[in-house]
Amino acid sequence: MSDQRHLELAWRRVTDWLKANAPVSYASLLPPVPEHTLEAADAQLRQYLGFGLPAELDALWRLCGGVEHQYIEANEEEGEVGSGAFLPGGIVLGPADALGVRLLECGRGDVWGGPAVVPWLTCDEAGPESGHYVGADGVGRWSMPDNLACDKPNFPSIAAYLDAVHRTLTQGPPDAMGPDVPGLVWGCLIWDDPEAPLLDDALEHWHPVH
């Protein structure tokens, strides 16, 4: 099976689960990124950093261009449930946000120090200053300013990451991806730590998948 086909199948398994179990999260998925936008992203990376768009990220963006949080009336006051944050690593970044982080201050050199990676996932929507990257060696974590070497991948690929997410959702154990476990609230898939939850008012409505 080709890497692209593996990614497509892994993504479909996760999104099919969302469609059946977390329809508000499923509604958060944005359409695929247009070809000209992908070409522009690849060209920017090559111009400023000397490497092109990672093949898996190109393939993912051809399936989904990121997410847009949906309006949830019960969530209006506190706004603590982001319908698009359905992965344990947060939201899928679109090209503009991903390259905005990777090309930060590129006119003065690469603040990341040169790794051929691009961020694609973050829980830090206000920044982002942390998240997951993807490169030829796989998927790992990054954070500013001290963890930008990007040389210790946790998964061999985005597809492997998505496979692990799907296994956690369908088979468990619930903490297979870390202390945050999958749960459902107001039609959304949200990962939280039952021992130290970030959810506040929404917590009483959040129910673990397992």
Language-model segments: residues:
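A C-terminal-region feature
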Residues: 1-41, 63-210
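Alpha-helical scaffold elements that line and support the substrate/ligand-binding pocket
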Residues: 42-47
